[in-house]
Swiss-Prot record:
This is Quinolinate synthase. The keyword Iron applies. Pathway: Cofactor biosynthesis; NAD(+) biosynthesis; quinolinate from iminoaspartate: step 1/1. The gene is nadA. GO terms for cellular component: cytoplasm. [4Fe-4S] cluster binds at residues 86, 172, 260. Gene3D superfamilies: NadA-like. Signal peptide: none annotated. Its main location: cytoplasm. Belongs to the quinolinate synthase family. Type 2 subfamily. It holds the Pfam family NadA.
Length: 303
């Protein structure tokens, strides 16, 4: 099956199934191109909550599809690649978080959306890299237990020094591949370029950046900047939209290792098979969903 056939069939099946295709900014270019909405975790969570379609095909990883099901329990939520997981989300379990909460009973628990439904269910509020700082600012507590990404926790702590941020020792394995040598090499090769990085990178990478933000923030910054060259310190998938938005600008990936294997598992044929066979449906136990719902609803209410 060639790509043109798959695209035509996906568009036909989308109408037949009354489906909406959501794709994360890290997805393959051809998958982004057939999606109804492409965005970061916050934008996609809001889209999942607001869509009127009966079926949501979530081109992303497991925790994203779970969040869509939590927010839209009456919808059929499909994930085209059932093996697309997230090591960061897997770095903390519900049981581990409950033990950590006992150590810090006065702390509010804020969990990054890159976490399981079970972890969200025992958290006070969720956040994304887009709104993590605002979520913490909105907290009435001066002590925050922030899970599971220690680098995002560190970034938030830098922005809000008057609050005590207690991080969990988890990290994104893709962003962790960036080294200071990568930064030195990229800046030597492209001295006129601005460096834009995701807050999931380590502190030593962030402190060398011109801008730190979520995938959508990075995309928008480059689009609106007067600069013509950019070094991009996040997953390679964002380059697709950046090049479409600003074909006259030059974009250089900070490291060739910035590829998330899990995000790249979803191919056009997987989206086609998902719609054709209504596979693989995502389920969240109702007792878990109800508890996690409050955490996610608070998240999407904060700009």
């Amino acid at each position: 099956m060639d790509d043109l056939f798959l695209v035509n069939e996906i568009n036909r099946l989308k109408i037949e199934r009354d489906a909406c295709i959501l794709a994360h900014n890290y997805q393959l270019p051809e998958v982004q191109d057939i999606a109804d909405i492409v965005g970061d975790s916050l934008a996609l969570s809001r889209a999942a909550a607001e869509t009127t379609n009966k079926v949501i095909v979530f081109c992303g990883v497991k925790f994203m599809a779970e969040s869509a099901k939590i927010l839209s329990p009456d919808k059929t939520v499909l994930i085209p690649s059932k093996y697309a997981g997230c090591p960061l989300a897997d770095s903390i379990t519900k049981e581990q978080l409950e033990m950590e909460k006992k150590k810090h009973p006065e702390a509010e628990v804020i969990c990054y959306v890159n976490s399981s439904a079970e972890v969200k269910a025992v958290s006070d509020v969720s956040c994304t890299s887009s709104n993590a700082v605002k979520v913490v600012q909105n907290s009435k507590s001066n002590k925050i237990l922030f899970v599971p990404d220690e680098n995002l926790a560190g970034y938030v702590a830098e922005q809000i020094p008057d609050k005590e941020i207690i991080p969990w020792a988890g990290h994104c394995i893709t962003h962790a591949r960036i080294t200071v040598d990568d930064v030195i090499k990229a800046q030597e090769e492209h001295p006129e370029a601005e460096m834009l990085v995701h807050p999931e990178v380590s502190e030593e990478i962030r402190e060398n950046a011109d801008f730190v933000g979520s995938t959508s923030a990075i995309i928008n910054y480059a689009k609106n900047s007067d600069s013509k060259e950019f070094i991009i310190g996040t997953e390679i998938g964002v380059l697709h939209k950046m090049k479409k938005d600003s074909p006259e600008k030059q974009f250089y990936l900070l490291s060739p290792r910035l590829v998330c294997e899990n995000m790249k598992m979803t191919r056009l044929v997987d989206v086609y098979n998902s719609l054709m066979n209504m596979q693989y449906e995502v389920f969240v136990p109702e007792n878990v969903r109800i508890k996690a719902l409050g955490s996610l609803e608070k998240m999407i209410s904060i700009e």
